[in-house]
Amino acid sequence: MKRKLDANDVPVPTEGSDAIKENVTFASLGLDARLLQGIAKQNFQSPTLVQSKAIPLTLEGRDILARAKTGSGKTAAYLLPILHSILKRKELSSTQCTTALILVPTRELADQVYKTVESFTAFCAKDVRAVNLTQRVSDAVQRSLLADSPDIVIATPARASLNANTSALSLANLTHMVIDEADLVLSYGYDEDLQNVAKIMPKGVQTVLMSATLTSEVETLKGLFCRNPEVLKLEEAEDEGEGVSQFVVKCAEDEKFLLTYVIFKLKLIKGKCIIFVGDIDRCYRLKLFLEQFGTRSCILNSQLPVNSRIHVVEEFNKNVYDIIIASDEHEVLGDEDEPKSGDAEEVEADDADEEKEDAKDAKKETKQPSKKKQKTGKKDKEYGVSRGIDFKNVACVLNFDLPTSSKSYTHRIGRTARAGQTGMALSFVIPSEQYRKHKPTSIESAKNDEKVLAKIVKHQAKKGKEVKPYNFDMKQVDAFRYRMGDALRAVTSIAVQEAKTREIRQELMKSDKLKRHFEENPGDLYHLRHDGELRPARVQAHLKHVPDYLLPKEGKKGITGGDVGFVGMHKTTENRIRKARAANKAKGRGKGRKSDPLKTFKAKSKK
């Protein structure tokens, strides 16, 4: 990235650049010593850009509206100063009251924030109490949790509004209010809840709005909660080679499954991967398809219990699982980033047009009812996986189904290349001439793939990013096509519905009945896996093994490490035992016939 030079040919630092002063440390920010111990335990070396800017302003009591990219440490940026102020207040007064309210759009993000509070307060847990109101417990249990006036309450706007109206949650002593992922909160339909919280909340409360984008929704929240806030537009400069490498593949509808099979079977992607699909049924169809080849994966969707979803994310971050198939049901409409070029007004107009087009396309899709009404399980409105959740060390984001807007695309690929790491985003696009050519694998949203791709390319170009074509050697890929066809035919609609029912039933049992057991025996939680085979599809054992003649040289090295060795045509070890058993049985049968007087008796005439 080129930088402007002053009169002396010295580079001028850009606004919000990543040039943080070398002497800025967590200790120099004036945080409590117990918090510094908790930070050190998390192996945080130095504050990120958003942390170094936001923490001092929050400690000064300023309202803040901060925009920073995903994975930049926004959660710690607002939690640390809040925890510091709570500890300082407790030194002067022992009165227990709720002083901080943190609003988030999804249950998964609420659980993540709660665990972050626990990690930072490891050395002062007795002095700071936090409650997560998004857990699936009865109203009586929630009232009992709030009766002790916890210092920090983490909730969705709906839960906070409900408990505030019933006087279970007291906001009389509130000093800090945070809205995390502010641009997403209103899109989840929390408008009335936020207005209700704003009415109940006392005046003079310090407000922090954190977001990856600054949209019209954020401006609405700014007018509702903030008083002359300090606006931080932070753009961390990426080093050469860092960030997300973006690729796109144009293919037929059934070729999505073929390419996915080849990618994972030949290990073309190294590391952990998140696969985004358009709906819940696609989750199970793809999982059952991959199971045919022995590739295990986990599922995330809104019909699974919240405890199971949270546990899947935790185990994924611990490297227990390598592949997650997630349904992105709460896509956000419109484009997000502010223009950086000189033609700002023109670009803003283009963005506004794109946002309207995205909204129109989405409305058209929602108005078209499905021909067959299927009984579906109850969806969790507070589910969200493409925003806010901190998936660790994700090597690749695979857009199996392209999102319906460039903004949703940006949020999806933000799950990789977090905190200065590198990552890859690969998207499958269906050309218009290929749409509905393979009806069993077709999806309605693919109709607009080419239009959405054009918006994505344009949007990424404004940010200086390029979406490159990813070229597969289709001659070598075609060798796997007949195996893909066998597996895909086995995954019928009935098999998908059976798998969905079985999975939800299993996860409900794991989530509810065993919750108390795992609280008492945390060691047993290790054995609770979510990537087991569903097995309602027709089992074809031969598909799990790739014949040597199908493997290209590069693929052979990737899957076997270059050492194939000798593979015999017969099972030498097991057959020896089986042959011996068969021989013994044969001996027994032969002796039996000889000793049978009815079969061996020979009548001879007397001479």
From Swiss-Prot:
Binding-site residues for ATP, renumbered to this chain: 68-75
Ranges that cross the membrane: none
Motif (DEAD box): 180-183
GO molecular function: ATP binding; ATP hydrolysis activity; DNA helicase activity; DNA/RNA helicase activity; RNA binding; RNA helicase activity
Comp. bias intervals (Acidic residues): 344-356
Bias kind Basic and acidic residues: ranges: 332-343, 357-368
Motif extent (Q motif): 24-52
Record key words, sorted: ATP-binding, Helicase, Hydrolase, Nucleotide-binding, Nucleus, Ribosome biogenesis, RNA-binding, rRNA processing
Catalytic activity: ATP + H2O = ADP + phosphate + H(+)
Enzyme Commission code(s) on record: 3.6.4.13
Residue ranges of every copy of the Helicase ATP-binding domain listed in the record: 55-232
Compartment(s) of residence: Nucleus, Nucleolus
Domain spans labelled Helicase C-terminal: 243-475
Region (Disordered): 332-380, 573-607
Enzyme class of the recorded protein, top EC level: hydrolase
Function: ATP-binding RNA helicase involved in the biogenesis of 60S ribosomal subunits and is required for the normal formation of 25S and 5.8S rRNAs.
Domain notes: The Q motif is unique to and characteristic of the DEAD box family of RNA helicases and controls ATP binding and hydrolysis.
Protein family according to the UniProt entry: Belongs to the DEAD box helicase family. DDX56/DBP9 subfamily.
Protein name, per record: ATP-dependent RNA helicase dbp9
Organism of provenance: Botryotinia fuckeliana (strain B05.10)
